[in-house]
Amino acid sequence: MLDGRIMGLDVGDKTIGVAVSDLMGLTAQGVKTIKRVGKKKDIEELKAIIKEKQVNKIVSGLPKNMNGTLGPQGEKVIKFCELVKAETGIDVEFWDERLSTVAAERSLLEADVSRQKRKKVIDMLAAVIILQGYLDFKINS
C-alpha cells in the first residue's frame, strides 16, 4: 500500500487531463480536465487536487516523436512539470505518452460517445491511460 496516491497528468496547450491512483496503486481513475488559463492558476488547481486526494507523486505523460526524440511539445511539458515540482515539492516522473490520446479517442468512439462529450473527457481519459500504464509497469517490475 502507498502512503498516498499517484497523480497522472496529460498536459496540453489548452487543457490538462488529471487522473489519480487508488491507495493501493493498482488502478487509475479520471478526476477532471482542467481548462488552462495560466500557469499560476493551473498549478493552483492541481495543488487543490493534490491536497484533496493526498497525492505524493506525479506522473506526467511525455509526448515524444515516433522516433523517440523530444519535440517542442515535450519540452513545454517538462518546463511546466518543473514548475509543478517547484510549487508543490512533489517529484514528477515522466511516462512515454505516445498514442495515449489515440487510445483514448478509440475507446470513446467504441463506446459511441458523442463528439461533444469526447472533447470534454478525452484528456482526462488520456491521463488515466498514462497513469494506468505506469502503475501496470510498476506492479510487473
Swiss-Prot record:
<dbReference type="GO" id="GO:0004518">
    <property type="term" value="F:nuclease activity"/>
</dbReference>
<dbReference type="Pfam" id="PF03652">
    <property type="entry name" value="RuvX"/>
</dbReference>
<dbReference type="InterPro" id="IPR012337">
    <property type="entry name" value="RNaseH-like_sf"/>
</dbReference>
<comment type="similarity">
    <text>Belongs to the YqgF nuclease family.</text>
</comment>
<dbReference type="InterPro" id="IPR037027">
    <property type="entry name" value="YqgF/RNaseH-like_dom_sf"/>
</dbReference>
<protein>
    <recommendedName>
        <fullName>Putative pre-16S rRNA nuclease</fullName>
        <ecNumber>3.1.-.-</ecNumber>
    </recommendedName>
</protein>
<keyword id="KW-0540">Nuclease</keyword>
<keyword id="KW-0378">Hydrolase</keyword>
<keyword id="KW-0690">Ribosome biogenesis</keyword>
<comment type="function">
    <text>Could be a nuclease involved in processing of the 5'-end of pre-16S rRNA.</text>
</comment>
<dbReference type="InterPro" id="IPR006641">
    <property type="entry name" value="YqgF/RNaseH-like_dom"/>
</dbReference>
<dbReference type="GO" id="GO:0000967">
    <property type="term" value="P:rRNA 5'-end processing"/>
</dbReference>
<dbReference type="GO" id="GO:0005829">
    <property type="term" value="C:cytosol"/>
</dbReference>
<keyword id="KW-0963">Cytoplasm</keyword>
<dbReference type="InterPro" id="IPR005227">
    <property type="entry name" value="YqgF"/>
</dbReference>
